[in-house]
Regions:
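Short beta-strand-to-loop junctions in surface cap/lid or active-site-entrance loops
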Residues: 1-12, 166-168
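Short beta-strands and strand-coil junctions in structured, solvent-facing domains, enriched
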Residues: 6-7, 26, 187
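Short beta-strand element of the alpha/beta-hydrolase
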Residues: 9-22
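Short loop/turn elements that form and flank the Walker-type P-loop nucleotide-binding site
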Residues: 11-13, 33, 42, 174-175
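Short, Asp-centered acidic motifs that coordinate Mg2+ and/or phosphate
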Residues: 15-16, 45, 120
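Conserved HGGG/HGGXW glycine-rich cap/lid loop of the alpha/beta-hydrolase fold
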Residues: 19, 26-29
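Short amphipathic alpha-helix adjacent to the substrate-entry channel of hydrolases
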Residues: 30-49
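Active-site-proximal cap/loop segments of hydrolase catalytic domains
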Residues: 35, 48-241
Length: 241
């Protein structure tokens, strides 16, 4: 929550940043987050939720996410956004979505498959095309490829579903402005994932800002790049949220 505000005493519905976590087989925990506090200090509420597939809720909850990228996993996020609106917490005209890695995929999927919900979106090293993502995984993930086919989908047997849930292949549905950030040396989510998305958006005249850092991988580590990224995030949100 922004400084000085509590849920039981909101003066009006708030601008909200929906922030799906990466993984996706990880979770958001209670505790301090400098990123969340940065966003809250700028006057935004931040909504983090543990959608199906998040760890810590048992095996059944984890397995409910298998082959559900862009489907029921995304529905959980969408349901959470509708709850925020129905509860009077979120201003329905001022909801952004921002995530990294899988959270970046969920950001693109949200902007693509529920375009009416979001006024802007920030994708940080996110997957845009599930087929090319599975083709370009790093060598140290090769031993897990069969498991990834079970969890995400098989490029042959599940091709139709993977195509249907790849935002880069449905960029014509996106209406909101986007900011996309990518490391040029990302071994997990190849730079081509972001290149595809940016090219598809620009072809359709959708506003997109693209930041690429040549000396970064899967997430920025160099302080000058981290500062550049968050300054750009702040400007983008000030303009669009």
């Amino acid at each position: 929550m922004p400084p000085g505000l509590t849920l039981d005493a909101l003066p009006a519905p708030l601008p909200v940043i929906v922030n799906p976590h990466g993984g996706p087989w990880s979770r958001d925990n209670w505790g301090f987050s400098s990123e969340v506090q940065f966003l809250c200090s700028r006057g935004y509420a931040v909504f983090q939720l543990n959608f199906r597939g998040s760890t810590g809720y048992g095996r059944d909850f984890l397995e409910k996410s298998y082959k559900q990228w862009g489907l029921t996993m995304q529905n959980d996020i969408t349901d959470g956004v509708h709850w925020l609106i129905d509860s009077g917490i979120a201003d329905p005209k001022r909801i952004a979505i921002y995530g990294a890695s899988y959270g970046g995929y969920a950001t693109l999927a949200g902007a693509c498959f529920t375009p009416e919900l979001y006024c802007c979106a920030i994708d940080y090293v996110g997957v845009s095309n599930l087929l090319t993502f599975l083709q370009t995984i790093p060598p140290y993930w090769r031993a897990m490829l069969d498991m990834m086919y079970e969890q995400i989908g098989h490029p042959d047997r599940d091709r139709a579903q993977l195509e249907a849930t790849s935002p880069a292949l449905h960029a014509d549905a996106i209406r909101c402005p986007l900011f996309i950030a990518q490391g040029a040396n990302d071994p997990r989510v190849n730079k081509d994932e972001s290149d595809q998305m940016v090219a598809a958006l620009r072809l359709r005249g959708v506003e997109v800002e693209y930041m690429v850092k040549d000396n970064e991988g899967h997430g920025f580590a160099n302080q000058e790049n981290v500062f550049d990224f968050y300054r750009a995030v702040e400007r983008f949100l000030q303009q669009h949220l």
